[in-house]
Amino acid sequence: LELVDQVSGELGLSQPPSVIGSTNNQTIQLLSLAQRLGKDLVRDFEWQKLVKAYIWQTQTAVSTTGNITAGSKIITNIPSTTNLQVGNVITGTGQTPYAEILTIDSATQVTLNAPVTTSTASVSMTFAKQDYDLPSGYDRMISDTNWDRTDHWRNLGTKSSQDWQFLQGGIISIGPRERYRIYNGKFRIFQALTTVYNFSFEYVSNYWVCATGSSEGTKAEFTADTDTCVFPDDLMMAGLKFYFLKAKKLDYGIELGEFTRALSYNKAQDVPVPSMSLAPVGMNQLVGPWSVQDGNWPSV
């Protein structure tokens, strides 16, 4: 890694012939600190090279049959559980509202997280998917970017645990728009949809390391000497020198100042910002209630 070579040279240390796989304690420490620095920078700011758009689709619900017994959480005699998943929400005769699959026991049996209220054989039921995978390299979602592109409105979230219990337990909690939360590393929606919808959101990726020949992040840590990263060289070098001196319990006051300045400069210059007026004037609205005539429909 050129980063380790450059920092070693500036600190008056011996420059290693290779970094990945080295058994030299100093080289191992510099690599470990560089890995930590990169991960810290990912969490520190929404760097434009780490912002990604994710577009995905919900899945069609699975309609099937099974045997249920009052007071039991087990459903038997399901023709096939192949397309079912833990967390799927069930609807049908005798089912508790928002009950979901707790375990898939066999090719014909599942266990729910709530008992049914009636006994029926070969009763119809529907399983809808509420948990969806987050994209590879996902670190965190960017606020207010989650949209339903099918119905053309913003999804509501993220919801807290308190909000979620209200949605599932409140008397009136259902609305026309989807609610969501990040739950157990999944994207969970309410209510679980039974047909295909197109959803989208933007997120910050934790893939800050670029593989050889690539200018985009494809992994979350250095794994080869030819790897580079999405962050500017001056920022990485200033940060690694500061991290190294701090780890060695040496004076790092000057290096901390250099790193702080580099971080501030690069944040400010990462994306363009609009000019700010000292005397802003609101723009006129071209379309409003005054654009609609009082009567005489249809207009000619």
Where would I find each of the regions flagged by the language model?
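Glycine-enriched, solvent-exposed interface loops adjoining structured elements
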Residues: L1-K73, T82-T103, A107-V300
